[in-house]
Amino acid sequence: MQQQALSTKQFDAVCLQAASLSDEIEAGRRLPAEFARQLAAQGMFSMFVPRDLGGHELSPVDGMARLEKLAQYDAASAWVCMIGATAALGSAFIKADIAQPMFAAENRITCGIFAPNGRGYRDGDDYVVSGRWAWASGSANADYIGLGCLLTENPDDDPKTAEMRLVMAPRELIQFHDTWHTLGLKGTSSGDVELSQARIPVAHSYAIGKDLPWHDGPLYQMPYFAFLAAGVGAVALGNARAAIEDFKRFVGVKKGAGERRTLAEKSGVQSQLAQAEVTLRATRLLYRDTLAGIWQDVCAGVEMTPEKRADLRLVSTHAVRQSVAVVRIIHDLAGGTSVYLSSPIQRRLRDAETMTQHMIASASTYELVGRVMLGGYHETMQL
């Protein structure tokens, strides 16, 4: 049965709740379990699950807009939903009768890590898998976690013959390590997870970029890695917007030491704020225009060439890295107020800086895209 569509009123209420819980989320280094299930009930983890399974099958444009807005209220909540929702694209690549309870059961939460840190081999109808993965965002509340693995047919096969697949591991098979003590995105429970000789049914796995979806909707023709990058970009843009709005709320009353004028009355502050604003708006426009163009092409059946996939990776990384530049300006303008852990602007900066360290939005993306622009594409590129 298809989940009820999330109304604007319901979504606004979820956003306000995220804001009210932001300090608790930060201190606890995870989303409270009850709140995570509320997000799931409102469809934040099933945005990109096929309607045939009970998901919402939102367009990338609509889904990323929701993540961007949620990030304005609490970046950690948006990050967890982003990782979970993009990981749930796998629901269209696993047989429907298996995927439905895995991805679309009531209040289901999933997350995923595509880094192929697992090793395993086939034993009958199962893969036997061991490995350890970092950055397992949302793992504190996840029912299933997609884990990247290099898998062979036999234990002694040459590793060069291994196939990269994501295995959907149920929570009860996973060992959780409390490693997420970080600069930012503290509330995302992105600690390490581990499997040790775990048996995962072959039917509970899929290969990104190789397996064909059982669902013929255009959403499942979107390039996975570029789609993930777009998700990170959406969260970064929302976080940067919130930093500007946070600053505008207090700049009219704050005065520097020994000064009569408020920060809002200073021409230098006015100029830098305007520059931050136009930087963010221009970056967001490029991001949304490119995402909408890619989606339009996918819906029209246009081939997703390496150049098109690289373009979405490029503008998404640009969104992340320009967003942190904007937040740095705001943090600097806020002065001494922003050094305190209680400062929302400081949290925005710490969260923004941490987003830049995710490999999908790192500076190495520019090298990757430049290589494609110069005709150097090869199939192992994560586009």
Labelled PLM ranges:
Residues A334-L383:
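Glycine-rich phosphate/cofactor-binding loops in nucleotide/flavin-utilizing enzymes
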